[in-house]
Structure formats: C-alpha cells, structure tokens
C-alpha cells in the first residue's frame, strides 16, 4: 500500500476510518480479484464503509464528483514532456501530480515532515531517469490511475489509449483474454437508425467489444 496517507488511519483518519473510507482486509488493502469466473464467490477482502459510518464514507462525499483535477493535469504534462511534445521536466510534473493527488484528499498532508520525493522514494515508486520510456509511462499512468479514483470511465480511456498501467486479467475476462475496447451500439440504435448504424459499423469495424476505437493503442 506504499504507506499511502489516504488509507492511513492513525495519522490522517477520522473516527477510526481512513480518508478513502476503505476497511483493511485480512490480507491488507486488497479488493476483489479482477475478472473472477462467473458463478464463483467473490473473494472480498477490503471494502468500503457504508453510508451509515459517521466518518469518511465515500457514498455521500462530494469529492467523488470530480471531472478533472490538478493531479490529472500534471500527469498529462508529464507524459507530454516525456515524449517531447512540450518542454519541461517529466520528472517534475510526475512529482507534482503525485503530490496533488494526495493533497486533493488530504490538504494538510504532510504532517510527518516528509515531502513528495521522500514519500515516492520510501514507496519505491520514485522517478529514475535511467528508466526506459515504457517504464516511465508505467510510473506516470499508475499514479494517474489512482488520481482518477472515482472517475472510472477516464481510467478505462487512459488504459485503452496507452496500455498503461498494467492491469490484472483474471480467468473470467473472456473476450479472448483482451480487455473490452468499446461498448456495442444499443439495440434501439440498430432498430431505429439502421442506415447510419450499418455505415458506422462499415467504417469502424464489427460491433463487438473487442473492436478497437481509432485512437486506441494496439
């Protein structure tokens, strides 16, 4: 868990609940396995506290209604600097993004005298200039994935666009073991607008979840 302050109860929690309102399971902070087989019982470990919990539950937290935050902006700039689209330090933008991601939820962080570089180093997710571009992209997009907490559609978009971060693929994934690339057209679109539907399918490819959109990373 990288000693993440957002799930730190002792220093940043309230009423025995951490800022993200996540309960620790017997194996630590771990959710349901991704892509488990249909019909199998879900192996739930960590879970969100319910809205009956008086402190730090996300069901009634206005922070879950984010559209775009400062952390996401900095990770966009980090990627742009990394691939040479803009000037500036990709490392600096990465650090600023990670810091903004924490401070979004905990404006008073840090309380313990550490800074973002120290925290990233202690968590073993610090920036190394010696890393290959793909390794740096993984660093950026793993932290961006967490910064997009509660914005799951954007997380899905970023994964399809870049292939990062590396996500687990369980046996229940189906679709040939490939992450879904798109949604299919609803039946009502096919039935009420058949001409344009057929034209769209002809231009875009088969109307199945494995057909990649035009901007997607192969």
Segments predicted by a language model, with ranges:
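C-terminal functional modules
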Residues: 102-106, 110-218
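Residue-level recognition of short, well-ordered coil/turn positions
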Residues: 85-86, 164
């Amino acid at each position: 868990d990288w000693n993440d302050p957002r799930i730190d109860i002792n220093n940043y929690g309230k009423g025995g609940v951490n800022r993200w309102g996540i309960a620790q399971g017997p194996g630590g902070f771990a959710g349901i396995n991704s892509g488990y087989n249909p019909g199998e019982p879900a192996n739930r470990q960590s879970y969100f506290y319910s809205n009956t919990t008086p402190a730090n539950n996300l069901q009634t937290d206005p922070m879950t209604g984010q559209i775009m935050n400062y952390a996401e902006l900095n990770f966009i700039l980090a990627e742009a600097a990394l691939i040479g689209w803009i000037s500036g330090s990709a490392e600096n933008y990465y650090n600023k993004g990670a810091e903004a991601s924490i401070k979004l939820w905990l404006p008073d962080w840090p309380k313990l005298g550490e800074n973002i570089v120290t925290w990233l180093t202690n968590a073993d997710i610090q920036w190394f200039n010696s890393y290959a571009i793909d390794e740096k992209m993984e660093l950026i997009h793993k932290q961006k994935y967490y910064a997009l907490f509660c914005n799951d559609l954007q997380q899905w978009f970023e994964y399809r666009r870049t292939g990062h971060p590396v996500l687990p693929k369980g046996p229940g994934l189906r679709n040939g073991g490939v992450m879904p690339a798109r949604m299919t057209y609803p039946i009502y679109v096919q039935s009420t607008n058949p001409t344009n539907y057929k034209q769209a399918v002809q231009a875009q490819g088969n109307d199945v979840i494995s057909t990649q959109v035009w901007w997607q990373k192969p």
